Amino acid sequence: CANSCSYGPLTWSCDGNTK
């Protein structure tokens, strides 16, 4: 994962990638 990570309601995305 990159330094910037965003957490969504159901899924989390890192550096524009969803996992």
From Swiss-Prot:
Could you tell me where this protein is found in the cell? Answer: Secreted
UniProt cross-link Beta-methyllanthionine (Cys-Thr), position: 1-18, 5-11
Residues in cross-link Lysinoalanine (Ser-Lys):
6-19
Q: Does the keyword Secreted apply?
A: yes
Q: Which residues carry this modification: (3R)-3-hydroxyaspartate?
A: 15
State a single Gene Ontology molecular function.
Answer: signaling receptor binding
GO biological-process terms attached to the record: defense response to bacterium; killing of cells of another organism
Q: Pinpoint the Lanthionine (Ser-Cys) cross-link.
A: 4-14
Principal subcellular localization: secreted
Question: What cellular component GO annotations does this protein have?
Answer: extracellular region
Out of the domains of life, which is the source?
Answer: Bacteria
Alphabetically sorted, this entry's keywords are: Antibiotic, Antimicrobial, Bacteriocin, Hydroxylation, Lantibiotic, Secreted, Thioether bond
| Post-translational modification (record) | Maturation of lantibiotics involves the enzymatic conversion of Thr, and Ser into dehydrated AA and the formation of thioether bonds with cysteine or the formation of dialkylamine bonds with lysine. This is followed by membrane translocation and cleavage of the modified precursor.
- Function statement: Is a potent inhibitor of human phospholipase A2. Exhibits only a weak antibacterial activity against B.subtilis, and does not display antimicrobial activity against S.aureus, S.mitis, E.coli, K.pneumoniae, P.vulgaris and C.albicans.
Family label: Belongs to the type B lantibiotic family.
What name has this protein been given in UniProt?
A: Lantibiotic duramycin C
**What is the protein's species of origin?**
Streptomyces griseoluteus
